[in-house]
Amino acid sequence: MQLEKMLTEVNIERSKFNTYNVLLQYIKAVTQKYNLNKVSSKYGKVLFIKDGVVKVSGLSQIKIGEKVEFVGKNLYGMALNLEATSVGIVIFGEDTAIYEGVIVKRCEQNFAIKVDKTMLGRVVDVLGQPIDGLGELKDTKTTRVMSVERKAPGIVTRKSVHESMLTGVKIVDALLPIGRGQRELIIGDRQTGKSAIAVDAILNQQVNKDIVCIYVAVGQKKSTVRRLVEMLNTKGALEYTIVVVSTASDAAPLQFLAPYTGCTIGEYFRDEGKHALIVYDDLSKHAVAYRQMSLLLRRPPGREAYPGDVFYIHSRLLERAAKLNEKYGCGSLTAFPIVETQAGDVSAYIPTNIISITDGQIFLEKELFNKGIRPAVNVGLSVSRVGSAAQSAVMKKLAGALKLELAQYRELARFEQFSSNADAVTTQILKKGKLTIELLKQVNNNPMSIGLEALMIYAMGTSYFQNLDLSLVRSEETKLLNYINSIASFKLYAACVDAVKAFNPKDTVFAEMCQSYVK
């Protein structure tokens, strides 16, 4: 009787009776009658949960990267694995409230955050919510809701890098110039000063404050982030900086999303025709977080246990840094990704991936750092592929031969260890190389203006500095800088030297400055 009732309900002829066909047609008919397809595509149910990753049934029409809500739990997640009978979802937050049977709802959109100018000077989490205890962010007329996953600017919208992005670090601005819209990797072992260079670049924008800075802390300790924020605030740099934080205690999905959130904030200002600088500190921890998520989702591991698409997660992030042309507002987004190496191995998987994506790298060496050469930049392994087009005429002229001189010094310094009987030319090259290295040293959190940088490089070639004892070089540099800042005309020239279009070292105010100081 029950079978007859089923057949009648779905209008199946008795002659076509077959147990399998009846059940199949019955399911289809009931699904259509009660519109269950729509319900099952929008809602799902947790099958099991483990280590922040859940398997969900239903959600048949969900897309990769789509945002989902755990109903009644005030928690969100993102779909990363689409399988035949289930969906793999990572949770953005604590998973203690999630259990088998919890209802999951599609949000039918990718993760998005609210972005506005009011974020300047604030510390926010991955979801764009303030965590600095200074109150909520209020919506204004300029507030935009932007997806954290956005397509990189196309070829037609871009313009070649041609404007300088000064870091305030002598060795970088002279030998590894960076332009607005460039992606320059900072790479090196742990505790070699990688973050210090990026932070100096942020502090250096205080001169004209026309660049908005975003610092993305991925997997950092809370105490480290707190010290950074306090230092930026003390130096007056926090007012044009936004700090996006995902600490080491946060779940892997939050650490994974942090760089994309920071990039979206930077794109907001870039699209407004402004200039932005973003620091990703660091993408090694970002890759580890993604590896953790992928292994929990049972994705097949590849080299160093990273999933096959680990290159893509970084390329799609870094390609969003660009210099836009006049039609699209002339804005720019400059990226400083940071990568940590193990024992100086730049041939590891993640370092080689990011080196191939970026427009150059600043390589910091542990050996140089331990010798007291700071910033510990290895000039031979470092390069800036597009920044030379943005370098000022003054710096280009003065620093032209500097890299060659340093290379010659490094080559001869190796032989100096084995032989003390060097000819006069070799002795001169070695002495000048040591002087140059001494003058290129710089204290952390003390960026220099382009004018003062150019002056110090000019001073390297003067007879006064050439004849100085190496132990006196740093103190003489400090005295010279104080002297320049005490004379209004010199200080004014140093401030506007970046705008000088043509430069002749023999006929310059620099010569007058140095001669005046020596007298």
From Swiss-Prot:
Residues carrying the site annotation Required for activity: 382
Location(s) in or outside the cell: Mitochondrion; Mitochondrion inner membrane
GO CC term (a single one): mitochondrial inner membrane
Domain of life: Eukaryota
One BP term from GO: response to bacterium
Gene3D superfamilies assigned to the protein according to its UniProt record, in alphabetical order: 2.40.30.20, ATP synthase alpha/beta chain, C-terminal domain (1.20.150.20), P-loop containing nucleotide triphosphate hydrolases (3.40.50.300)
UniProt KW Nuclease keyword: no
GO molecular function, one term: ADP binding
InterPro entries reported for this sequence: ATP_synth_asu-like_sf (IPR023366), ATP_synth_asu_C (IPR000793), ATP_synth_asu_C_sf (IPR038376), ATP_synth_F1_a_nt-bd_dom (IPR033732), ATP_synth_F1_asu (IPR005294), ATPase_a/bsu_AS (IPR020003), ATPase_F1/V1/A1_a/bsu_N (IPR004100), ATPase_F1/V1/A1_a/bsu_N_sf (IPR036121)
Main location: mitochondrion
Binding site for ATP: 188-195
Alphabetically ordered keywords of this record: ATP synthesis, ATP-binding, CF(1), Hydrogen ion transport, Ion transport, Membrane, Mitochondrion, Mitochondrion inner membrane, Nucleotide-binding, Transport
Similarity annotation: Belongs to the ATPase alpha/beta chains family.
Complex and partners: F-type ATPases have 2 components, CF(1) - the catalytic core - and CF(0) - the membrane proton channel. CF(1) has five subunits: alpha(3), beta(3), gamma(1), delta(1), epsilon(1). CF(0) has three main subunits: a, b and c.
Stated role: Mitochondrial membrane ATP synthase (F(1)F(0) ATP synthase or Complex V) produces ATP from ADP in the presence of a proton gradient across the membrane which is generated by electron transport complexes of the respiratory chain. F-type ATPases consist of two structural domains, F(1) - containing the extramembraneous catalytic core, and F(0) - containing the membrane proton channel, linked together by a central stalk and a peripheral stalk. During catalysis, ATP synthesis in the catalytic domain of F(1) is coupled via a rotary mechanism of the central stalk subunits to proton translocation.
Protein name per its UniProtKB record: ATP synthase subunit alpha, mitochondrial
Natural source organism: Dictyostelium discoideum (Social amoeba)
Lineage: Eukaryota, Amoebozoa, Evosea, Eumycetozoa, Dictyostelia
